[in-house]
Structures are given as C-alpha cells and as structure tokens.
Design a protein with these regions (language model features):
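N-terminal acidic, glycine/proline-rich low-complexity segments
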Residues: 1-170
Length: 170
C-alpha cells in the first residue's frame, strides 16, 4: 500500500487484496485469501484470446490457490513468475519455489501459459550498482527515490567492499 501512496494511486487501494498467510498443505486444497478469490473471479472476465496477465513474485501460493478454486482460469491467464531456477541449473533449491513446493507443482502442471523468470541462471545476472541507482532512479519521482534509497541501504548493509552491485529481484 505504501507503493501505491508513492505512486499517487490511492484509488488502487480498493482493489489491492491481502494474500495467503500460509502455504498450501497439498496440491488439492487452496489457501483461501482475498487475493486468491479475487484472482479466480477476475480471471473469469477474460478469454483465451484476451487473457489476464498475472505478474507474481515470491511464493506462488495465491495464484495456485486461484487455480484450485477455478481450474478453468488456466486458459484465461498468462502467468509471469519470478521463481524457480533455470532449466539447465543443477538444482531447484530456490527460495520462492521452496516456500511452497505444492504451489509450484500446480502452476507448472496446470496447463496455464507460463513465462518463468528463473532466479539462478537468469535473473541472478540482472544486477545494478549504487552509482546506477543514483543516476537512473534518484530525483525521478517519489517511488524511484524510495526504491533507490532502500536498495542502496540494503546494498551497503551487505556489501563486502566499497563498490557493490546487487541482483534486482523482489
């Protein structure tokens, strides 16, 4: 909600929904949450020809729960997810996937169009440095300032040298 305030989009707070508080217990039972319920309902207003694009980061519990609530939405959505590792990677020990393995199995196995942004082996190569944050973000708008200051603070906290760069995922 803070990001919506920074974007001066208070109007979107009414259509911003809380997600799940737990992970899936199995591959058959959804975790009910306002976010999953809204996604299941909202996706029904779209068609295979004009699908709803769903962008997700972190654990994929909400999307998997929506698919369990209304399996027919698989033909009405295109899921873009930052999670899992690249197919050539030797393992799939990745934070977002590990949080909810059952949800990962659902989204990969349901037949929905999926654009995976693999963490290790792909997104791990997307990095940005402090000078880049300062040059490209600071002074553009309140949201850019917030994100740049936050990322610079985090980068400095974890940096092992004066000069650093960090991966730009969630």
């Amino acid at each position: 909600l803070k990001l919506l305030t920074l974007l001066k989009r208070e109007d979107l707070k009414a259509v911003t929904f809380k997600g799940s508080e737990t992970y899936l217990m199995d591959e058959d039972t959804p975790v009910l949450s306002p976010a999953a319920e809204d996604l299941a309902k909202r996706a029904m207003d779209y068609t295979p020809e004009k699908p709803l694009y769903v962008v997700a980061i972190g654990a994929i519990t909400n999307v998997a729960s929506a698919l369990l609530l209304k399996p027919e939405i698989r033909d009405r959505i295109v899921l873009v997810w930052l999670g899992g590792n690249a197919l050539h990677w030797p393992d799939n020990r990745e934070f977002n996937m590990y949080q909810d393995v059952a949800a990962g199995r659902i989204v990969f196995g349901c037949g929905a169009a999926l654009v995976q942004l693999p963490c290790a082996g792909v997104v791990s190569g997307f990095s940005v440095s402090e000078p880049e944050f300062k040059d490209y973000f600071l002074g553009k708008n309140e949201l850019c300032d917030y994100l740049a200051h936050y990322a610079i603070e985090e980068g400095r906290r974890w940096a092992q040298a004066e000069t650093w760069s960090r991966v730009i995922w969630d």
